[in-house]
């Protein structure tokens, strides 16, 4: 059995809801997964997208072992309470949320999605949808040829036309 396509990102923020992770967890995650014959990679800065991308690319090259990528992050980065359990599972609050956004160079007070992000998402979603739709149509047309009666029943059900013979 080969799990070379399995890549897991592990968020190593060292914080739990109750406080520092060290209060309740002493396991060395890296050594544990290495002992289980996983490829273990580490990203030193979870805010470095390029470093994460490189680790994922390296993980994809491994053909036989699963890959664990330990991503070292600071929970609540940019918040006054970053790195603490005070930002774990609790809202930041308006002012602290604004400060966290500013630390990322994002100067919008309210919830906001930049137009270029929205357009990119829309374009990719439409492309993926068309591809899936075309695959479905091809598959359904093949099904119709082999099972015309059942295909008609499915088409009727999709159209909201039900005929029950009980």
Q: Where are the model-predicted features located?
A:
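Glycine-rich ThDP/TPP pyrophosphate-binding loop and its adjacent helix/strand module
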Residues: 1-127
């Amino acid at each position: 059995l080969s799990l070379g396509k399995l890549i897991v990102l592990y968020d190593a923020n060292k914080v739990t809801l109750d406080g520092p992770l060290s209060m309740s967890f002493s396991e060395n995650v890296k050594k544990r997964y290495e002992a289980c014959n996983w490829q273990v990679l580490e990203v030193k800065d979870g805010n470095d997208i390029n470093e994460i991308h490189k680790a994922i690319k390296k993980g994809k090259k491994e053909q036989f072992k699963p890959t664990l990528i330990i991503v070292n992050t600071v929970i609540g980065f940019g918040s006054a309470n970053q790195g603490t359990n005070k930002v774990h599972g609790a809202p930041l609050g308006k002012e602290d949320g604004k400060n966290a956004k500013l630390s990322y160079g994002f100067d919008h007070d309210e919830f906001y999605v930049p137009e270029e992000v929205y357009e990119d998402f829309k374009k990719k979603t439409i492309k993926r949808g068309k591809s899936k739709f075309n695959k479905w149509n091809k598959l359904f047309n093949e099904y119709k040829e082999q099972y015309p009666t059942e295909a008609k029943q499915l088409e009727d059900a999709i159209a909201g036309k039900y005929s029950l013979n009980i």
